[in-house]
Amino acid sequence: MKAVVMTAAGKPDVLQLQDLPMPAIQGRELLVRLKAAGVHPVDTKLRARGTYCPERMPAVLGCDGAGIVEAATPQAQNFKSGDAVYFCNGGIGGHPGTYAEFAVIDERFAAAKPASLSFAEAAAAPLVLITAWEALHERGRLQAGQRVLIHAGAGGVGHVAIQLARLHGAQVCTTVSGIEKTRLVRDLGADCIVDYRAADFVAAVNDWSGGGADLAFDTVGGAIFQRTMHCIRHYGDLVTLLQPGNDTDWKEARLRNLRVSFELMLTPMLYGLDAAQRHQADILRRGGALFDAGKLRIH
């Protein structure tokens, strides 16, 4: 099969189109003929810096995929040849990823592709959907009626997070830049929109929320993470996707008694946590129902 192979860490030219043997399947695995693969910032970071398993090079990147089941083992119970699936699996240095004609996945970690999405749309959804879902519902303790700050609301994770928060009955303030992104997040249901290039988001959020958001979701990191501590209520939640720098000043978080959580949806893959990967597949099934009901969309 054809695959885009990462031969070393470096610039884009380390990605080379090569012929690889067709993968075999065992246990409850599916062989999926990929129709589309997602491209995310994590893919470019792994390509530039190296994968989580540098000893297993060369590697096939790509976490997200959507396609048709080409073959299934006799032990597979949920899918058969011809079924359309989507998933987030592999591509971080251990299990081969989705930058290939075929991918192998344990059927327990896959979900039926939402009928309302094209294969390209479905392949763009798993990582951002799981990330936003876990960040809000599992790390951030999201409750109906809360006021939630979501940074970079027009981004991949951000635009899904806005919709999930609104579906759960929360009010949303989000940061963006420019007219086009403002229109997008308004259309997604954001209640408060702050152009961070023209206004101080800390002051804007404190004014909108009456003293601080109940929950803040940081998808940017750095100085934004630091400043966000100043617009969360006492005993509120701050969830971040990024690792804070060594120069982070935690004083405000401590004084406000914030609960700071980290969201990395790759953890189950990194450590082989089967139950957690099955849970993520359930998130894809629940998200798929929202897509098909017209309550959630991927941009």
Whereabouts are the PLM-identified features?
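Residue-level marker of beta-strand positions
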Residues: 83-84, 102, 147, 167, ...
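Glycine-rich phosphate-binding loop and adjacent beta-alpha segment
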Residues: 223-296
